[in-house]
């Protein structure tokens, strides 16, 4: 093989290998920071992974909020109209957090199916519902439009 051709081949191989390593490292780094969204029905059915950090959301079930008297621990249930999942959180809840309103939680699902939240986000006005929650509500209750704001939701399920 001619020396110039050999040098060109080595340069191309180096670029291909370096690019492959760079892409692999980026995919690895991004996968660690990826929080996928799961509605309560997918969490209860086991579709949501146990252990890694995920996001979940739905409407806070009225009457389900229980606050500890001696700490900042709070437990409540969220529903998508099909299933409900228990959420445990320790910390201050957002000012707009309320029963019957949409919430998105970030955390891990335990082996028992309890969502251990590290962050709770509440909708920030009466007409806004997080897109993930809105889509989950539409899918779970035959696309009924009033579900976007958690009104008229059958919380008995």
UniProtKB/Swiss-Prot annotation:
Gene3D superfamilies, per the entry: Nucleic acid-binding proteins
Sorted UniProt keywords: Cell inner membrane, Cell membrane, Cytochrome c-type biogenesis, Heme, Iron, Membrane, Metal-binding, Signal-anchor, Transmembrane, Transmembrane helix
Coiled-coil regions listed in the entry: none
Topological relation to the membrane, as annotated: Single-pass type II membrane protein
Membrane-spanning parts: 9-29
Highest taxon listed in the record's lineage: Bacteria
Known function: Heme chaperone required for the biogenesis of c-type cytochromes. Transiently binds heme delivered by CcmC and transfers the heme to apo-cytochromes in a process facilitated by CcmF and CcmH.
Membership in a protein family: Belongs to the CcmE/CycJ family.
PANTHER family assigned to the protein according to its UniProt record, in alphabetical order: CYTOCHROME C-TYPE BIOGENESIS PROTEIN CCME HOMOLOG, MITOCHONDRIAL (PTHR34128:SF2)
Name of the protein in its database record: Cytochrome c-type biogenesis protein CcmE
Native source species: Saccharophagus degradans (strain 2-40 / ATCC 43961 / DSM 17024)
Origin organism lineage: Bacteria, Pseudomonadati, Pseudomonadota, Gammaproteobacteria, Cellvibrionales
Gene: ccmE
């Amino acid at each position: 093989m001619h020396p110039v051709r050999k040098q060109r081949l080595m340069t191309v191989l180096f670029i291909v290998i370096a690019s492959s390593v760079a892409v692999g490292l980026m995919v690895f780094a991004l996968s660690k920071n990826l929080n996928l969204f799961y509605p309560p029905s997918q969490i209860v059915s086991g579709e949501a992974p146990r252990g890694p950090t995920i996001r979940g959301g739905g409407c806070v079930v009225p009457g389900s909020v229980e606050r500890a008297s001696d700490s900042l621990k709070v437990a409540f249930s969220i529903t998508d109209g099909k299933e409900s999942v228990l959420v445990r959180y320790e910390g201050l809840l957002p000012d707009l957090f309320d029963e019957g309103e949409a919430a998105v939680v970030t955390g891990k699902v335990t082996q028992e199916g309890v969502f251990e939240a590290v962050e709770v986000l509440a909708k920030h006005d009466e007409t806004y519902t997080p897109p993930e929650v809105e889509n989950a509500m539409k899918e779970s209750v035959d696309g009924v439009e009033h579900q976007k704001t958690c009104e008229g939701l059958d919380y008995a399920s």
